[in-house]
């Protein structure tokens, strides 16, 4: 028992779904394993009227991240005395439902030129390594005596993307054609490191107001175009060449990009300027 207690005390970050010896546990609450799931329904139909082709559909996703939300965000449930959390002040988060319409349109303007347009909304879960944390790790974050660069998130929303495309196909020879497409993509609700402004000094559970959390609040935009040259198969030879240019911009390239600014509190405001993201690949 003494060895177990000592091991438990030395393992300050704790774990989810396993005990201190690495054995799987099947229990409820913060110490139990998480079982996220996604349920999806997609309906699509195509309508043709002469040379005009319309493709319309809708996708419905129901995301269950199997995570938690705070009953009172202004008073996070830190149990300072027992070095843990008040689990009765944390409840299961709700399933998030996202409806995503999709629409495509194509029509010819001459015998050689065809225009096409597309619009769609897309949704996905945040990265699952961001929201989850054990009660021991929550204790470290809320106590404020340790710098925790990878804290936890509560009740995160799905990340949403809206995408537009417009382009044309031009058959300039009987066996050769070019495709030119311009696209724009806007992603919102991306996860970023932040604080809860609701938590004030002197809150009920004495939680450090500068405690960090993952929240939805960042965005990125991607604009660009794609040029494709293609030929039909002639004497068992077919040519296909494509070039894509894209420009990805946003405030933070990573959920933890804001960590340095937050660690300086009010001395260093969070980044607000839109910049090229470090993973952008223009060509």
How should each PLM-predicted stretch be described?
Residues 2-15, 70-81, 85-86, 131-140, ...:
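Flexible, surface-exposed loop regions and adjacent strand-edge segments
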Residues 49-52, 108-110, 161, 173, ...:
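Outer-membrane beta-barrel channels and translocator barrels
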Residues 183-186, 198, 204-283:
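Gram-negative outer-membrane beta-barrel transporters
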Residues 36-42, 98-101, 151, 161-165, ...:
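Transmembrane beta-barrel architecture of outer-membrane proteins
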Residues 1-112, 126, 130, 144-146, ...:
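Signature of Gram-negative outer-membrane beta-barrel scaffolds
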């Amino acid at each position: 028992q003494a060895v177990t207690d000592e091991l438990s005390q030395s393992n300050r970050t704790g774990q989810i779904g396993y005990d201190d010896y690495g054995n799987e546990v099947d229990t409820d609450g913060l110490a139990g394993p998480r079982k996220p799931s996604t349920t999806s329904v997609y309906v699509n139909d195509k309508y043709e009227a002469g040379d005009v082709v319309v493709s319309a559909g809708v996708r419905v996703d129901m995301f269950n991240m199997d995570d938690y939300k705070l009953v009172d965000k202004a008073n996070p449930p830190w149990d300072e005395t027992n070095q843990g959390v008040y689990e009765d002040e944390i409840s299961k988060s709700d399933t998030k439902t996202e409806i995503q319409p999709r629409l495509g349109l194509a029509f010819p303007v001459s015998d050689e030129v065809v225009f096409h347009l597309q619009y769609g909304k897309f949704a996905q879960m945040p990265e699952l390594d961001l929201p989850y944390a054990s009660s021991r790790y929550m204790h470290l974050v809320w106590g404020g005596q340790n710098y925790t660069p990878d804290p936890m998130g509560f009740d995160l929303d799905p990340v949403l993307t809206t995408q537009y495309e417009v382009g044309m196909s031009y058959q300039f020879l009987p066996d050769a054609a070019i495709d030119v497409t311009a696209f724009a993509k806007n992603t919102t609700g991306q996860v970023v490191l932040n604080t809860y402004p609701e938590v004030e000094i002197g809150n009920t559970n004495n939680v450090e107001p500068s405690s960090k959390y993952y929240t939805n609040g960042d965005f990125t935009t991607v604009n660009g175009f794609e040029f494709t040259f293609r030929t039909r198969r002639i004497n068992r030879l077919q040519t296909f060449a494509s070039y894509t240019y894209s420009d990805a911009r946003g405030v933070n390239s990573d959920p933890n990009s804001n960590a340095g600014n937050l660690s300086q509190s009010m001395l260093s405001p969070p980044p607000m300027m839109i910049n090229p993201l470090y993973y952008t690949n223009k060509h």
